[in-house]
Design a protein with these regions (language model features):
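N-terminal cap/leader regions of alpha/beta-hydrolase-fold enzymes
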Residues: 1-234
Length: 234
């Protein structure tokens, strides 16, 4: 764990996973609506296994610090309420501070850092790329990205967007709008897993998890990050 001093005088806790080598580029993991729980911690560990220093900040610190909700129907309802209470601009500001903190860690080589966001975090990763300068972003089923495509020109880094073909919360038309913009950016990529819905990567949520879609998307994420923010490890 790491404690990040914040500009407002408070602090923000963050989970940190180190690669076997002890050093590597950074990967800022932006949480889903359930908070920094087992799934997000495991996402950090998966990235650490690829050679990244992974950090997941508690972006609910302005709502309820340390909020971690179960991946079941009751938890989903509570998580959606918590996400509605979250100020998106404030969360992007907190993510920007976390990105700087990650880059300043002695274990992070050359200050290089990507952002990888899931669900809520996918949208926040996009917002972070507008507001700051991550070296790359990976956005897993980020709702609201299609409505912020007018800001795409402000993003200067490579980007990979994942969507599920059967997403219950993001219309297919939104994914297609993102695809149209991606076609104009040679450093942007999009993948739609037709057999996946929303949160298909979430192994903690049986109602959403689709292992085949997860495996394909993770391979794309791995290869994208290897090109955009290489670690030297495979």
């Amino acid at each position: 764990m790491a404690t990040i001093p914040m500009p407002d005088g408070g602090t923000m806790e963050a989970f940190v996973a180190l690669p076997e080598a002890g050093r590597g580029p950074g990967a800022l993991v932006l949480m889903e609506i359930f908070g920094v729980g087992p799934y997000i911690r495991r996402a950090c560990e998966r990235l650490a296994e690829l050679g990244y220093v992974a950090m997941a900040p508690d972006l609910y610190r302005r709502v309820e610090p340390g909020l971690e909700l179960p991946h079941d129907e009751e938890g989903l309802g509570q998580a959606m309420q918590a996400a509605q209470r979250l100020d998106s601009q404030g969360a992007v500001e907190d993510a920007t501070v976390a990105l700087d903190a990650l880059r300043s860690l002695p274990e992070v080589t050359d200050g290089a850092a990507a952002a990888v966001g899931f669900c809520l975090g996918g949208r926040l990763a996009y917002g972070l790329a507008v507001a700051a300068d991550p070296d790359a972003i990976v956005c897993y089923y980020g709702s609201g990205i299609a409505d912020a495509l007018d800001q795409a020109g402000e993003i200067r880094c490579p980007a990979l967007f994942h969507f599920g073909g059967g997403d219950q919360f993001i219309p297919r038309s939104d994914a297609e709008r993102v695809r149209a913009v991606v076609a104009e950016r040679p450093d942007w990529e999009i993948a739609i897993q037709e057999d996946g819905g929303h949160a298909f990567d979430n192994h903690e949520a049986p109602m959403f998890y689709r292992p085949e879609a997860t495996a394909r998307a993770w391979e794309l994420t791995r290869d994208f990050l290897a090109r955009a923010v290489p670690t030297g490890a495979r």
